[in-house]
From Swiss-Prot:
Record's compositionally biased regions (Basic residues): 198-207
Matches recorded under CDD domains: AAG
EC category: hydrolase
Gene Ontology biological process terms in this record: base-excision repair
Region annotation Disordered: where it falls in the sequence: 182-207
Name this protein carries in UniProt: Putative 3-methyladenine DNA glycosylase
Residues annotated as transmembrane: none
Pfam family, one: Pur_DNA_glyco
EC number: 3.2.2.-
Ranges of compositional bias, category Low complexity: 182-193
Coiled-coil region list: none
Gene Ontology molecular function: alkylbase DNA N-glycosylase activity; DNA binding
Lineage start: Bacteria, Pseudomonadati, Myxococcota, Myxococcia, Myxococcales
InterPro entries: Formyl_transferase-like_C_sf (IPR011034), MPG (IPR003180), MPG_sf (IPR036995)
Amino acid sequence: MKLPQAFYARDTRTVARALLGKVLVHLDGGVRRAARIVETEAYHGPDDRASHARAGPTPRAAIMFGPPGRAYVYLIYGTSHCMNVVTGPEGFPSAVLIRAAEPIEGCLHSTRGPGNLCRALAIRREHDNGRDLWGEELFIEDAPAPREAVVTGPRVNVGYAGPWAARPWRFALRGSAWVSRPAPAGARAARAPAPAPRPRRPRGSGP
């Protein structure tokens, strides 16, 4: 069952935790590509200095000010896409970055790290930015609550955000081999299968 809009219309930190264990699905030309979410980051409100919303509703970040349950997909360094979910009440800019997932089916690439995840599921800004997440092509399916414990830590590569850099708004499933590096303390207890060679994960990928 697809998650309804009401799921996303909550505090972004609540949604970031609740998304762990859910299944991100992209129907790419009729091919189902799916992965279980194991790591997220919350970007909360206009005062969050790590968020794109800190500069107001710019052409790139305007979608964060819109209704919840929309995909916010942007390009970094001209090469990698990042998939976010708009959350909270409309007008309060917030989003959850999906940092990593465990591959389930149809994945084209490693799913560890936000750029890799979008590459694996063929999610692209030009096709998917602004989509609602209860449609027919890009959506998140409900799943049982994860058995793994949730660990938290600071978000990745947001040192420029001053005191906001230390907020423990990164969430991951303990023991998942697919959590991106550096993992939150205690998050990694296994090694993922060796992926095919891939570009280095871009830095500073949050919305």
